[in-house]
From Swiss-Prot:
The lineage of its organism: Eukaryota, Amoebozoa, Evosea, Eumycetozoa, Dictyostelia. This is UPF0512 protein H. Belongs to the UPF0512 family.
Length: 95
């Protein structure tokens, strides 16, 4: 849930990418602001090379780069885990 909390706390930092999870931009989190743009289909499989537009933000943080879901395999199991975490978080909030 730590990731969910960090995303939700800055989910509308810029909003330029309109992420499906409402947090495509994590301004100031890393050198590349659109750090979760892979969820918007902006990943392109480049995984943090910078070409993906957003992934470089996560991969720039060596620790986050290891998540894999954000790095290269965008849309893989880790992306699903994040979405599940967010769904759980929303349920807890509304109920």
């Amino acid at each position: 849930m730590a990731i969910f909390k960090s995303i939700s706390s800055i989910s509308n930092s810029t909003g330029s990418m309109g992420s499906s999870i409402g947090a495509s931009n994590l301004n100031g989190f890393a050198s590349n602001d659109n750090s979760i743009s892979c969820f918007d289909g902006g990943c392109g499989g480049s995984g943090g090379s910078g070409g993906s537009g957003g992934l470089a933000g996560w991969s720039g943080l060596s620790g986050w780069g290891g998540i894999g879901g954000f790095n290269g395999s965008c849309g893989g199991s880790n992306a699903n885990i994040i979405n599940i975490d967010i769904d759980i978080g929303r349920r807890r909030r509304c109920c």
